[in-house]
């Protein structure tokens, strides 16, 4: 058969005990590569598919692909089939912003540099049906102060259970900080500027203390001794900020968020004791739900709504 590439996808869920063995998708990729080679398969690295070959003037069975390596093109024949496992297109600013204009160059991405739409466009050129390409998930817990996923994201997400996130132009909250990722990001984009998460020393449970330490060490999360310092540093209206913090803390004390319906953790305390921990937050593209259309057997569907013989899709490419 033809070559099989194993490429990164957005993320994987790995049991906590497995993290030390090779966190997230890396351990999966390495294990698959090892099994392929044990079975006598070959992996062609730095080899980019540029065309899918189909019988019948690009309407029939997929018979292989043309790929480029070191400036040279090679045709690979597939006797059983071709699997599209090219991942998402989160790093492809031109393509993603064509689907969702909000996701321009001002929005970062948690993915690796190879997460482009190249493989998807090769498939579309071969008559594959693209499905819901504008359904691109953003991650609301990242900071514009660092590249990619960064080290502060785990702290921002953990502290969202305890801390308010405010609009620096008003000093006010704008969303339930524990809402789903889409609603959170949509609300952030509506504000239109990076937001401020304001946590405090009384709201650092043991299970996320290491995340805070990492964010502080990187300079992404910063310590402040008062609301006045925060307002001065980030040009936040002080009166609005104080009123919001008083209102939020009253909700925490009462155990009911009358502003946005947030469910407080049982160990949540009012955000009143310095040091305050402030982190700028802004969404980053995280996962592409759209991709090539497949059926229940992973067969890729063509523009005629019929399965394309010899072509399969897997992972974030679908």
Describe each region flagged by the PLM.
Residues 116, 120-236, 240:
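An anion/pyrophosphate-binding glycine-rich loop and adjacent beta-alpha core
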Residues 12-19, 44, 110-112, 152-157, ...:
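Short Gly/Pro-enriched turn/cap motifs at secondary-structure boundaries
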Residues 57, 68, 167-168, 295-296, ...:
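Short, acidic, Ser/Thr-enriched surface-loop or helix-capping motifs
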Residues 1-73, 93-94, 143-144, 252-273:
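Conserved redox-cofactor binding core of oxidoreductases
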Residues 51, 240-318:
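A glycine-rich dinucleotide-binding beta-alpha-beta segment and adjacent secondary-structure elements
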Residues 62, 173, 300-301:
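Hydrophobic "anchor" residues
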């Amino acid at each position: 058969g033809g070559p099989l590439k194993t490429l990164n996808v957005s993320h994987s869920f790995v049991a906590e005990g497995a993290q030390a063995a090779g966190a997230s998708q890396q351990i999966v990729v390495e294990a698959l590569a090892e099994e392929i080679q044990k079975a006598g398969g070959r992996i062609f690295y730095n080899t980019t598919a540029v065309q899918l070959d189909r019988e019948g003037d690009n309407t029939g069975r997929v018979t292989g692909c043309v790929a480029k390596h070191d400036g040279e093109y090679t045709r690979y024949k597939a006797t059983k089939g071709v699997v599209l496992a090219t991942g998402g297109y989160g790093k492809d600013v031109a393509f993603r912003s064509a689907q969702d204009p909000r996701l321009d160059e001002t929005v970062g991405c948690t993915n690796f540099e190879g997460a482009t739409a190249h493989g998807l466009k090769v498939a579309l050129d071969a008559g594959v049906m693209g499905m819901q390409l504008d359904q691109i998930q953003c991650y609301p817990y990242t900071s514009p102060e660092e590249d990619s996923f960064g080290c502060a994201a785990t702290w921002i997400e953990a502290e969202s259970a305890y801390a308010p996130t405010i609009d620096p132009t008003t000093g006010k909250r704008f969303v339930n900080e524990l809402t789903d990722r889409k609603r959170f990001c949509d609300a952030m984009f509506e504000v239109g500027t990076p937001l401020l998460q304001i946590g405090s020393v009384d709201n650092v449970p043991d299970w996320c203390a290491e995340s805070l330490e990492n964010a502080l060490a990187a300079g992404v999360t910063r310590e402040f001794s008062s609301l006045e310092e925060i307002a001065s540093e980030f040009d936040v209206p002080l009166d609005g900020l104080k009123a919001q913090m008083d209102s939020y803390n009253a909700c925490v004390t009462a155990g009911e968020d009358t502003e946005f319906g947030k469910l407080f953790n049982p160990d949540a305390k009012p955000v009143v004791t310095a040091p305050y921990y402030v982190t700028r937050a802004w969404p980053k593209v995280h996962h592409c739900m759209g991709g090539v259309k497949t059926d229940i057997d992973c067969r890729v569907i063509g523009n005629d709504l019929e399965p394309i013989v010899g072509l399969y899709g897997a992972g974030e490419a679908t």
